[in-house]
Design a protein with these regions (language model features):
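Active-site neighborhoods and metal-handling regions in enzymes and metal-associated proteins
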Residues: 1-229
Length: 229
C-alpha cells in the first residue's frame, strides 16, 4: 500500500486489489491497483513505474526515520533504489512529522474522546479489582470495559506488578496474583477512528510502603504543576 504525494499536491494511491473498494470510499480518486497476493511483486514494480513518470533527478521522499513504515521489505526498497539511480531517494520523515503535529478540530475531538473513555475505564477499574486476583484477570476486565465503552480496539496492553513497585512495563499480564503491598501498573494503547491514546495507571493493593506513597505523590504533584503551564 503506497501513497504518492506530488509537490503540486496531487495524490495517487497504489493498493492491492483487495483494498480498492476501501480506498474508493475516500477522497482519493487517482488509484492504481496490482493483483494480490503476489509474493514476488507486492506493488513494487507499479511503484517504480509511477516514479519513472517524474523528471529525472527528482527527490523521492520515503519515511525512513523514527516510528515510520516503508510498507515494503528493506530488500525491496534497496532494489528500487538501485534500479532508479537517476532519482534522489531521501528521508522525508521530518516533513511527515511536522504535518502530523497539526491537528484539525475533528482530529482533536477523536483524541479527546478516546482518552476520556480510557480514563473513565481506569477510574472505574478500582471498583472491580481486589487482592488475590491475577494480573491476567484484571487485564481482561479492563480490556472488556474499554470495548464496551466505545474504543475500536486495543493496540497493546502491558501489565506488571511487584512489592513496592515493578521492574518492567512491556510484558503481557501473567497469572501472578496480587498480594499485600503490591503495586500494579497497566499501560495501554487504545484507538478510536484511527486515533490513539497511550497512558498508564498504577494501583496499590493492601498496605503500601510509605516511601512508595511519597514517591507517587511527588510525581502526581509534579504532573499537575506541569499541566498548569
Amino acid at each position: 500500500w503506497f501513497l504518492i504525494i506530488s509537490k503540486n499536491g496531487k495524490i495517487k494511491a497504489l493498493v492491492p486489489s483487495i483494498g480498492l473498494s476501501a480506498i474508493e470510499s475516500t477522497f482519493i480518486k487517482d488509484i492504481e491497483v496490482w493483483q494480490s497476493p503476489n509474493p514476488k511483486d507486492e506493488g513494487t514494480s507499479l511503484l517504480k513505474k509511477i516514479i519513472k513518470t517524474f523528471p529525472k533527478n527528482s527527490n523521492i521522499g520515503f519515511e525512513l526515520g523514527m516510528e515510520t513504515y516503508l510498507r515494503m521489505s528493506i530488500k525491496e526498497f534497496l532494489k528500487i533504489k538501485k534500479d532508479l539511480q537517476e532519482y534522489n531517494f531521501i528521508d522525508s520523515t521530518n516533513i511527515v512529522w511536522s504535518l502530523r503535529k497539526i491537528k484539525s478540530d475533528l482530529e482533536i475531538k477523536n483524541i479527546e474522546k478516546v482518552c476520556s473513555i480510557t480514563s473513565k475505564v481506569f477510574n472505574n477499574l478500582i471498583n472491580k479489582i481486589s487482592l488475590g486476583m491475577s494480573e491476567r484477570e484484571i487485564a481482561t476486565i479492563f480490556k472488556k470495559d474499554l470495548i464496551n465503552n466505545g474504543v475500536d480496539y486495543i493496540m497493546y496492553l502491558s501489565c506488571a506488578s511487584g512489592i513496592n513497585g515493578y521492574n518492567q512495563i512491556i510484558c503481557n499480564p501473567s497469572e501472578k496474583k496480587l498480594g499485600d503491598g503490591d503495586i500494579l501498573i497497566i499501560d495501554t494503547g487504545s484507538t478510536l477512528n484511527g486515533y490513539f491514546c497511550d497512558f498508564d495507571r498504577n494501583f496499590g493493593f493492601g498496605n503500601i510502603n510509605q516511601k512508595t506513597l511519597d514517591a507517587y505523590n511527588k510525581l502526581w504533584n509534579a504532573t499537575e504543576k506541569t499541566l498548569e503551564i
